[in-house]
């Protein structure tokens, strides 16, 4: 371990593993350590089930009705992948896809007036949907056609809207869309957690709706993918990539000290040995004095013996509860998967509800989601701090990832990865460029 590295990475969460893989592909010498004996950090999948009970300090062993403990892989953080999103692109460009199998999630649902409705995934479904009335549907369709044709680099597609200036509120007004449709569009399609976006320039929202539509177009049932055996497979896939390109991995390594000189990181001390480095990437748990808390997320993992009511017995789905349906500022999400994904015993379902904490009683806040899941066989409640780095790391060369937010997809995580990459390398992260570098350094496949 007493060696020189270009980059040392602490923690094997998804952000850290992807960056470690990318740095190795870029020809950098990487050492990757984690104090835990397992991969994934905050974004791990826990197996066997007994370990989940221990982690949440639930007394006794899981009952026999839960099946074999090792049939379970329970994600601590619930997220899906957008089929056409940034994470899938990263998986494809790095060829990490060869280590993973994905299934399309069976449906996306939205909560309205105490009931859940399927988010239409075809024009026929949209016409038949009871989410909106007939005239509303026509206006909504016109809006979707506009979005599909929109190209921020081609002013001919703007139709009088300035993507950098016109607010989304004005765009909705132009198409004469009602409040219900606005809620649905902003929260179930553009996947915003709050309504702050309404007064921002519309370009970002239109592109988010395009991402949803393009992801949906890929597989037809829903825009979401989920890996067999759980999300813990993702960091492991990128860790393999890093190892193939010469990265060194060490799990179960207690980190004693991050060594600084003149305000800059020069190495990491573990078990009495020092590994030297020029740059350090880590999650907030390794540098508690360099991060600040900006909020909290509550997540409740629920084990069920039945599919969720009114979802056509889907073996996987997402439910979005828009904030103003339950008088909140931020949406509540439910991600549900099952034995079909090799993450639960036969006939069992895992539903994870999550939201941004807004009051002193987070468990009360998440109740509307739990009511949709009853009866619940066992629940595991966690409240996590949302931590962000206090500075950009340019002085110290310590680059800290953000904790995982309450969104149900990885787009914000990928934004963080690209942001850290840019700060470390001084250039934008470019998929094509990465592919070329890989071929230059390691030859064509």
UniProtKB/Swiss-Prot annotation:
The modification N6-succinyllysine is found at residue 57. It is found in: Cytoplasm; Membrane; Golgi apparatus, trans-Golgi network. Keywords: Acetylation, Cytoplasm, Golgi apparatus, GTPase activation, Membrane, Phosphoprotein. The modification N-acetylmethionine is found at residue 1. GDP-dissociation inhibitor preventing the GDP to GTP exchange of most Rab proteins. By keeping these small GTPases in their inactive GDP-bound form regulates intracellular membrane trafficking. Negatively regulates protein transport to the cilium and ciliogenesis through the inhibition of RAB8A. Ubiquitously expressed. The modification Phosphoserine is found at residues 130, 382. Pfam families: GDI. One of its GO terms (molecular function) is Rab GDP-dissociation inhibitor activity. Belongs to the Rab GDI family. It is a peripheral membrane protein. GO terms for cellular component: cytosol; Golgi apparatus; membrane. Its main location: cytoplasm. It comes from the Eukaryota. The modification N6-acetyllysine is found at residues 112, 269. One of its GO terms (biological process) is negative regulation of protein localization to cilium. Interacts with RHOH. Interacts with the GDP-bound inactive forms of RAB3A, RAB3B, RAB3C, RAB5A, RAB5B, RAB5C, RAB8A, RAB8B, RAB10, RAB12, RAB35, and RAB43; binds RAB3D to a lesser extent. Interacts with DZIP1; this interaction negatively regulates the interaction of GDI2 with GDP-bound RAB8A. Coiled coil: none annotated. This is Rab GDP dissociation inhibitor beta.
């Amino acid at each position: 371990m007493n060696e020189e590295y270009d980059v040392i990475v602490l923690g094997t969460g998804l952000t850290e593993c992807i960056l470690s893989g990318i740095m190795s592909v870029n020809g950098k010498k990487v050492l990757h350590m984690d104090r835990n004996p397992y991969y994934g950090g905050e974004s791990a999948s826990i197996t066997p089930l007994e370990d989940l009970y221990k982690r949440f300090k639930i007394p006794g062993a899981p009952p026999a009705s839960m099946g074999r403990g090792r049939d379970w892989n329970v994600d601590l953080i619930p997220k899906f992948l957008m089929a056409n999103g940034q994470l899938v692109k990263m998986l494809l460009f790095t060829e990490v896809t060869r280590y993973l199998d994905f299934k399309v999630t069976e449906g996306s649902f939205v909560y309205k007036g105490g009931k859940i409705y399927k988010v239409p995934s075809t024009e026929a479904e949209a016409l038949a949907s009871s989410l909106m009335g007939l005239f509303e549907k026509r206006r909504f369709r016109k809006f979707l056609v506009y979005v599909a044709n929109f190209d921020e680099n081609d002013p001919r597609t703007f139709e009088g809207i300035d993507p950098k200036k016109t607010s989304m509120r004005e765009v909705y007004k132009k198409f004469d869309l009602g409040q219900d449709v606005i809620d649905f569009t902003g929260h179930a399609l553009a996947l915003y957690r709050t309504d702050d976006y309404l007064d921002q320039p519309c370009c970002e929202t239109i592109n988010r709706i395009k991402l949803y539509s393009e992801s949906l177009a890929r597989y037809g049932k829903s825009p979401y993918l989920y890996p067999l055996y759980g999300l813990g497979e993702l960091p492991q896939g990128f860790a393999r990539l890093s190892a193939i390109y010469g990265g060194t991995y060490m799990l179960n390594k207690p980190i004693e000290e991050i060594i600084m000189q003149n305000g800059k990181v020069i190495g990491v001390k573990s078990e009495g040995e020092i590994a030297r480095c020029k740059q350090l990437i880590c999650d907030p748990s390794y540098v508690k004095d360099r991060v600040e808390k900006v909020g909290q997320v509550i997540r409740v993992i629920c084990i069920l013996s039945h599919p969720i009511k009114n979802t056509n017995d889907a073996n996987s789905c997402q439910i979005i509860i828009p904030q103003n349906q339950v008088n909140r500022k931020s949406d509540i999400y439910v991600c549900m998967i099952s034995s079909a994904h090799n993450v639960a015993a036969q006939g069992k379902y895992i539903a994870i509800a999550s939201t941004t904490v807004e009051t002193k009683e987070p468990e009360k806040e998440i109740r509307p989601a739990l009511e949709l899941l009853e009866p619940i066989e066992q629940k595991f409640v966690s409240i996590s701090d949302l931590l962000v780095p206090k500075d950009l790391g340019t002085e110290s060369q310590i680059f800290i990832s953000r904790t995982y937010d309450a969104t149900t997809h990885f787009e914000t995580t990928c934004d963080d990865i690209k942001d850290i990459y840019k700060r470390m390398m001084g250039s934008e992260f470019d998929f094509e460029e990465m592919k070329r570098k890989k071929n230059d350094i390691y030859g064509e496949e």
